[in-house]
């Protein structure tokens, strides 16, 4: 078996194992951590199959590379979404350029946290160790441009978002969250009455 070399262990941690090429079958296989069983990639979870290509190609991602990443949060549970945001920031800090689309308020908030921590850590460096975040997992907001795509009945509006006190605020995501919270509260009130 030939194992790809790795830079960061972030993806390896997310998949909780290793992906390697079986030299006999010429197919990639997944080996769960602390297990000798090799699983054909198509038989693994969507989290593993979705991250496989990036995991395999990670060693070839160089400074100046341009990566397009559609919904990096797709098929990832919330903890893995947070790890993915950190991994993306480390790639950007290594000089990669990225174009990312997302529908996830959780993913956007994790990116916001990593951007805001860049400012906060300048006057409170201990906060990084307190939150278990590495220096290469935060970055300045001036490396980022965020656009909010909002669809109404006849057209799509595209608005560049400003980085404010609490990061980038995407109204299109917040409106849906507010409606869900209002609906949930109304249902809970009805149950309690």
Region locations from a protein language model:
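Walker B catalytic acidic pair
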Residues: 70-72
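Phosphate-coordinating catalytic segments in nucleotide- and nucleic-acid-processing enzymes
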Residues: 1-66, 94, 135-193
């Amino acid at each position: 078996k030939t194992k790809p070399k790795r830079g960061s262990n972030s993806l390896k941690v997310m998949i909780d194992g290793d992906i390697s090429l079986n030299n006999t079958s010429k197919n990639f296989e997944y080996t769960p951590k602390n297990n000798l069983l090799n699983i054909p990639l198509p038989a693994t979870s969507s989290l593993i199959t979705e991250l496989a290509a990036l995991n395999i190609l990670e060693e070839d991602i160089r400074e100046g590379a341009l990566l397009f990443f559609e919904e990096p949060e797709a098929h990832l549970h919330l903890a893995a979404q947070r790890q993915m945001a950190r991994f993306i920031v480390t790639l950007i800090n290594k000089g990669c350029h990225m174009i990312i689309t997302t529908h996830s308020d959780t993913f956007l908030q994790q990116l916001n946290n990593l951007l805001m921590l860049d400012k906060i850590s300048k006057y409170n460096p201990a906060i990084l160790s307190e939150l278990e975040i590495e220096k290469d997992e935060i970055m300045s907001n001036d490396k980022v441009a965020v656009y909010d795509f909002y669809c109404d009945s006849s057209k799509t509006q595209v608005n560049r978002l400003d980085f404010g006190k609490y990061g980038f605020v995407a109204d299109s995501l917040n409106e849906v969250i507010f409606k869900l919270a209002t609906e949930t509260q109304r249902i809970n009130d009805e149950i309690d009455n």
